[in-house]
Amino acid sequence: MDSQGKKVVVCDNGTGFVKCGYAGSNFPEHIFPALVGRPVIRSTAKVGNIEIKDLMVGDEASELRSMLEVNYPMENGIVRNWDDMKHLWDYTFGPEKLNIDTRDCKILLTEPPMNPTKNREKIVEVMFETYQFSGVYVAIQAVLTLYAQGLLTGVVVDSGDGVTHICPVYEGFSLPHLTRRLDIAGRDITRYLIKLLLLRGYAFNHSADFETVRMMKEKLCYVGYNIEQEQKLALETTVLVESYTLPDGRVIKVGGERFEAPEALFQPHLINVEGVGVAELLFNTIQAADIDTRAEFYKHIVLSGGSTMYPGLPSRLERELKQLYLERVLKGDVEKLSKFKIRIEDPPRRKHMVFLGGAVLADIMKDKDNFWMTRQEYQEKGTRVLEKLGVTVR
């Protein structure tokens, strides 16, 4: 709470999950899937202890997903369906989750870098007009990650469910001209895994199976350090084969797909996306930075978001960066490579890094009124109030 007794809420609305809680806390109060479901057949049945309603949100929708038509209101970090997004916020602030009176609260929201201004304007409009928060602040996700890690300078590789971005931050300021965005993230890898499993003869085609495969991905997938070697293992042995039990009791066997799916992050052409993979994008970003800052950036690469949680990802990233540096900067001179210092930080709680940074920032700002956009300012200026965040509103 701030000095006037107003609660300060932090809400990290991801494409795949909502993480929400309060300023100063060191873990989100609630984490739930950002999905909205509607029953396929109209019925007033109960499944277990959950009643089927016309509109199901979050955890409940996830549990009963086989009976629902499931929608995600956000795609690639941008809100696509505002009505469903409002249902999601109603659920977040309502009795099921935070249970707050939004009129007496301030809220800190997050968004990916390079997001359309229209998206941010609409979010602020909904927060003030529908929920009537007393203050609103919108922070860039990558900067919050660094705050959570206690750094002011570094490069954040943030890969969530909807978008991956590489965002250099110098002395606490994100550098938009160097920020790169890659629209391959967790959701695309889940989709690719579904495709790979289909080739093996397992069909997952209902919107609800998507959640099932996502859970399987989180349990079994990893990033291969040396792809040729992994492929050899997959073809010639059964070391990689794991059994997985589906919710309906069927058991399926998953082998090479375990590393083939996340490989799309490093080789986008596998899922028909043009452009370079995450390692080369990171290398290009740092090399495009000012020559005096590059060494600092190589020493402070911070991973964040659920799609960086694959075992083997940090070491693969380091290997590819060294390889690229050797080829393109040192022109193949191996002796100089020992002087090249690189450090990839993979904090264990990186899945919720953005929320943690938001909780730190909101706690520092809670009584500094000049940081927040207030309801009064919004009533006077409308969406022009965003200029307070240092954003030019056209």
Curated annotation (Swiss-Prot):
Subcellular location per the Swiss-Prot or TrEMBL entry: Cytoplasm, Cytoskeleton; Cell projection; Nucleus
Record-linked Pfam families: Actin (PF00022)
Entry-linked PROSITE patterns: ACTINS_ACT_LIKE
GO molecular function annotations of the record: actin binding; ATP binding
InterPro entries registered for this protein in UniProt: Actin, Actin/actin-like_CS, ATPase_NBD
Annotated GO CC locations: Arp2/3 protein complex; cell cortex; cell projection; cytoplasm; nucleus; site of double-strand break
Any one biological process term the GO annotation gives: positive regulation of transcription by RNA polymerase II
Alphabetical UniProt keywords: Actin-binding, ATP-binding, Cell projection, Cytoplasm, Cytoskeleton, Nucleotide-binding, Nucleus
Binding locations of ATP: 160-162, 214-218, 305-310
Family: Belongs to the actin family. ARP2 subfamily.
Free-text function comment from the UniProt entry: ATP-binding component of the Arp2/3 complex, a multiprotein complex that mediates actin polymerization upon stimulation by nucleation-promoting factor (NPF). The Arp2/3 complex mediates the formation of branched actin networks in the cytoplasm, providing the force for cell motility. Seems to contact the pointed end of the daughter actin filament. In addition to its role in the cytoplasmic cytoskeleton, the Arp2/3 complex also promotes actin polymerization in the nucleus, thereby regulating gene transcription and repair of damaged DNA.
Quaternary structure and interacting proteins, as annotated: Component of the Arp2/3 complex composed of actr2/arp2, actr3/arp3, arpc1 (arpc1a or arpc1b), arpc2, arpc3, arpc4 and arpc5.
Name of the protein this chain belongs to: Actin-related protein 2-B
Naturally occurring in which organism (per UniProt): Xenopus laevis (African clawed frog)
